[in-house]
Amino acid sequence: VAAVTSARRRCRIDVEIAIVRPAHPFMDGCAVRFTFPNGYTGSVIRHSGSYGGSQGLWEIAVMYDGVIVYDTPITDDVLGWQTEEDVKQVLNQIRALPKRAV
């Protein structure tokens, strides 16, 4: 329990725009997902193997229906080496994406 609480503190990103799954330990760091009404999710991770994780920075992936997508105007890959402010900006961009056509 103490390790989980510590991970949550280290992995806190304040965003008031999404349904947030609580941060949970992931590898030797943490992961949190922000899901928006448009069906998209921002998957945010930080651990020693993530892009920028060893420098205390974040990696973010754009997901839809639980799968990473590579065809959004935001990026065609995961975004590494992101500061907390960068993550907030990307999450706002994900929130603004139109729903995907079925």
Tell where the protein language model's regions lie, with residue ranges.
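Catalytic phosphate/metal-binding cores of nucleic-acid and nucleotide-processing enzymes, i.e., regions
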Residues: 2-102
